[in-house]
C-alpha cells in the first residue's frame, strides 16, 4: 500500500449487506474501508476527509450516485478518476457522463475484479 499505510476507500451503498461485504473484501486486501449509508452520507464524508478511492452505488436514497459524482466534479474533480460506480443497471450508467468519467462495475461482481479496480483507481 502507500508506504505501509492502508489506502482509505469510501464505500457508499444503501444496502448494509453490500457495504459489509465490500468493506470486508477491501479490508482483507489491505485497504481501510469507510462506510456511507447513502449518497448524502457519502458527500458529508467526502467533504470532511480525503480518500484514495471511492466506491458508490448508483441507486441510493436522498442523493444517488449521479448526485455524488456531480458533487465531486464541483468540489474534488481529481477524485472522479478514482471513483467506481456499482450498478445493477449498467446500461443506465453507460448512457450518460458516468461512462466517460468513472469506472463502472456491474452487480453482481467478482470480488477479485473489484479489488483490482480499487487498486487501479487508487493509483491514478
Regions found by a protein language model. Give the residues of each.
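Charged docking surfaces used in two-component/phosphorelay signaling
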Residues: 20-28
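A Lys-centered signature of the CheY-like receiver
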Residues: 107
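Active-site residues of response regulator receiver
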Residues: 57
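Acidic catalytic/metal-coordinating carboxylates
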Residues: 38-41, 64-70
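Non-catalytic signal-transmission and effector/linker regions of two-component phosphorelay proteins
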Residues: 1-8, 112-124
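Receiver (REC) domain active-site loop signature in two-component systems and cognate sites
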Residues: 60
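Hydrophobic/aromatic residues positioned on beta-strands within the core alpha/beta folds
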Residues: 86-87
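Acidic, metal-coordinating helix/loop segments flanking the phosphotransfer/catalytic sites
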Residues: 35-53
Amino acid at each position: 500500500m502507500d508506504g505501509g499505510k492502508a489506502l482509505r476507500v469510501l464505500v457508499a451503498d444503501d444496502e448494509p449487506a453490500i457495504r459489509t461485504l465490500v468493506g470486508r473484501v477491501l479490508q482483507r486486501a489491505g485497504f481501510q474501508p469507510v462506510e456511507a449509508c447513502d449518497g448524502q452520507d457519502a458527500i458529508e464524508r467526502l467533504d470532511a476527509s480525503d480518500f484514495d478511492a471511492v466506491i458508490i452505488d448508483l441507486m441510493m436514497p436522498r442523493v444517488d450516485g449521479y448526485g455524488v459524482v456531480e458533487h465531486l466534479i464541483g468540489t474534488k474533480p481529481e477524485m472522479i478518476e478514482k471513483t467506481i460506480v456499482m450498478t445493477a443497471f449498467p446500461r443506465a450508467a453507460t448512457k450518460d457522463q458516468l461512462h466517460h468519467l468513472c469506472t463502472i462495475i456491474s452487480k453482481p461482481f467478482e470480488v477479485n475484479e473489484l479489488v483490482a479496480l480499487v487498486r487501479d483507481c487508487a493509483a491514478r
